[in-house]
Amino acid sequence: RHFRLVLTTQAQRAEEARQQAISGGTEPSAFPDTLPGYTEYGRDNGIRLSAVWLTHDPEYPENLPAAPLVRYGWTPRGELAVVYDRSGKQVRSFTYDDKYRGRMVAHRHTGRPEIRYRYDSDGRVTEQLNPAGLSYTYQYEKDRITITDSLDRREVLHTQGEAGLKRVVKKEHADGSVTQSQFDAVGRLRAQTDAAGRTTEYSPDVVTGLITRITTPDGRASAFYYNHHNQLTSATGPDGLELRREYDELGRLIQETAPDGDITRYRYDNPHSDLPCATEDATGSRKTMTWSRYGQLLSFTDCSGYVTRYDHDRFGQMTAVHREEGLSQYRAYDSRGQLIAVKDTQGHETRYEYNIAGDLTAVIAPDGSRNG
């Protein structure tokens, strides 16, 4: 597939804003042609992504979307202001501090209340305000953060370390219980103690950070072993039983031996795919699969030869399932990709409705009865 990324400069966005103001009969707002060259995050050249188009799809060459897959709108200061989905509907909006560029003071999911944020002089969030739900306040002290919700429930986070190695080592929960965590010198989890005082220990590999051993509060241990590609090759449980895995030269799983000794083998017919075309279990039963170029399951044949086929649309969503004896199920979606109907071979249809936020609000059964 080929995609076209539409980029805009600050000068282009400024001119577009001026033209929109003129055509609307309003006074053009202050929209600078350039942005400050440097920010605390590095150099800013003012270039922003405004849209992503699908321009070529070998699976659906004659059925390309007539609109962008996603669009972005920006403020005069180059801050992300709005996000539109593939249906053209606005799904996110952001508001920023007038004084501090890039500091978000409000965020809204379409159809939901606007969440607002307040900050202290150090740029830390002190309040998160939700007009239709729980709001939170944050109080910062050295190695301690107190979080209080609008029902006056309080949690306290105790921290250790500095900058990127700062970790929460103790948490006082609203119900009075306390949990604790321990970390090594590079910030990797070494132990967790629950509210009852029971400690689980973790042993990460010094180089990779992968967990090599877990010891539960009762002293029982599980061990994990990896190859040089960091793939799990063996896992031994507290009972001493072992799970083993083998991989081919491309790193694909080709055999798994369960703790009970049963072996499952995986076969591949495409050197460029990590999706198996067949599996064989310990009884010799064989299952086969076919996949699309995008990794979507197209067919599955079980050990008795029973075939199930799957259809997908250009967005990768499943549109139909075809089983033996002509039994099929069809699925329909709206422009936002939400499931709106499921119909079987006999024409029995179940429909689904959503609100503007994308929440499921009603299910209409084939007999017309409505739930929701």
Locate predicted features.
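Extended charged/polar low-complexity repeat regions
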Residues: R1-G372
